[in-house]
């Protein structure tokens, strides 16, 4: 899959990356549309030390309209083909994983 990789101030590169493995409690989504927000612009223009959790060499971007393409065997709230708008800082019932969705680093 293609991913926008943040390389530092004023530098992003599109790279081919592996499709993530789907665990029993995971949902894999495919981006249909993405947007650029104020956080993206601030980090791009001013570098990673802007108070936002964006890592150099990490996947960049977090506002998407997506489609569910695979679900883990324990997932009951989503179905393959469903369109979703993922909120990158929330993972139902498991806040340790918040921020991992969509590569929001």
What is each of the regions a protein language model found here?
Residues 1-2:
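Extreme N-terminal starter segment of soluble prokaryotic enzymes
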Residues 20-34, 48-95, 99-100:
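Glycine-rich beta-strand-centered segment in the early N-terminal region that forms part
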Residues 5-7, 45:
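Residue-level signal for short segments within beta-strands and strand-turn junctions
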Residues 11-15, 38-39:
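Short N-terminal binding/cap micro-motifs at the start of the first secondary-structure element
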Residues 10-11, 49:
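Short beta->alpha connector loops
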Residues 39-45:
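Cytochrome P450 core scaffold surrounding the K-helix E-X-X-R motif
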Residues 101-105:
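Short peripheral tails and domain-boundary helices/loops at the edges of structured domains
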């Amino acid at each position: 899959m293609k991913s926008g990789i943040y390389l530092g101030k004023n530098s992003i590169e599109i790279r081919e990356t592996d499709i993530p493995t789907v665990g029993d409690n995971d949902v894999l989504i495919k981006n249909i549309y993405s947007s650029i927000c104020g956080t993206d612009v601030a980090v791009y223009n001013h570098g990673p030390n802007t108070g936002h959790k964006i890592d150099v060499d990490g996947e960049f971007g977090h506002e998407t309209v997506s489609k569910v393409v695979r679900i883990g065997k324990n997932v009951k709230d989503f179905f393959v083909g469903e369109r979703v708008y993922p909120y990158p800082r929330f993972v139902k019932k498991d806040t340790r994983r918040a921020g991992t969705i969509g590569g929001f680093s």
